[in-house]
């Protein structure tokens, strides 16, 4: 468990899981450099439709915040492809990348090294938001293996991780066994429509909440941001 934590910090990250650059531009214009936001998360839908460079260019018209690429899921290939992945992201102007290293520890180490060579921030995840993911809930992946992903990444010097808001008990068990540092950053999907409650994660000091449809489909995104900001500031 982490001790002597710094003050609680909440930030928001829009998950840009859309097809049209017009939607990206709309959200980027509204968010800008708002202090309640950490950055933007883009995935395969935008990357495969338009190319990541075009996505980055669109966001950069309105914001200097970090742009995170979530390949959904990266690091599930052989170790050697990590270098090509990292170079592709760097050329596009991406700042950070999320890895879910289900291909094993050799791939994890190689992909971390490749991202660092390209000066990209590394974020590692092992647990996902949906049901029937872990073996204990009817999924394919051994619970212990998921825990080992986090521990191995910590041993490799990673200090930024993905944990889902929708599974507080499972995250708690990971926190009890993995030696996360007090300054570790946690990126959490599940805020908004999936019903995740950040107040259930008292052990996390630096918490970046990933929000998708609740913001992207809001009738009034500006009002949604104002309401969310008020709630998160009161919880800090």
Residue ranges and their predicted role:
Residues 18-20, 44-48, 73-75, 101-103, ...:
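Active-site-proximal loop/turn and secondary-structure-junction residues that shape catalytic pockets
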Residues 1-68, 76, 141, 152-155, ...:
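Conserved N-terminal beta1-alpha1 strand-loop-helix module at the mouth
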Residues 52-71, 115-127, 174-191:
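Alpha-helix-loop-beta-strand connector modules within alpha/beta enzyme cores
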Residues 165-215:
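A C-terminal functional module that forms or caps the active site or interfaces directly
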Residues 76-169, 182-183:
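Conserved anion-binding
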Residues 23, 51, 84-85, 107, ...:
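Short acidic active-site motifs
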Residues 10-16, 38-42, 67-71, 97-99, ...:
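Hydrophobic faces of well-ordered beta-strands that scaffold small-molecule active sites
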């Amino acid at each position: 468990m982490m001790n002597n934590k710094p003050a609680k910090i909440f930030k928001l990250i829009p998950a840009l899981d859309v097809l049209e650059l017009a939607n990206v531009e709309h959200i980027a214009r509204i968010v800008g450099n708002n202090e309640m936001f950490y950055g933007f998360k883009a995935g395969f839908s935008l990357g495969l439709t338009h190319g990541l460079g075009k996505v980055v260019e669109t966001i950069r018209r309105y914001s200097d915040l970090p742009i995170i690429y979530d390949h959904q899921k990266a690091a599930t290939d052989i170790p050697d492809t990590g270098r090509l992945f990292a170079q592709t992201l760097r050329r596009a102007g991406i700042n950070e990348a999320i890895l879910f290293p289900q291909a094993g520890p050799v791939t994890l180490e190689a992909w971390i090294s490749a991202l660092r060579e390209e000066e990209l921030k590394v974020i590692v995840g092992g647990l996902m938001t949906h049901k029937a993911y872990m073996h204990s809930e009817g999924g394919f992946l051994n619970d212990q293996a998921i825990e080992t992903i986090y521990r191995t990444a910590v041993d490799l010097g990673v200090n930024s991780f993905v944990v889902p808001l929708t599974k507080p008990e499972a995250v708690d068990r990971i926190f009890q066994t993995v030696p996360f540092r007090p300054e570790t950053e946690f990126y959490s999907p599940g805020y908004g429509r999936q019903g995740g409650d950040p107040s259930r994660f008292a052990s996390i000091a630096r918490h970046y909440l990933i929000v998708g449809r609740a913001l992207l489909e809001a009738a009034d995104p500006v009002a949604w941001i104002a309401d969310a900001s008020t709630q998160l500031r009161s919880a800090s």
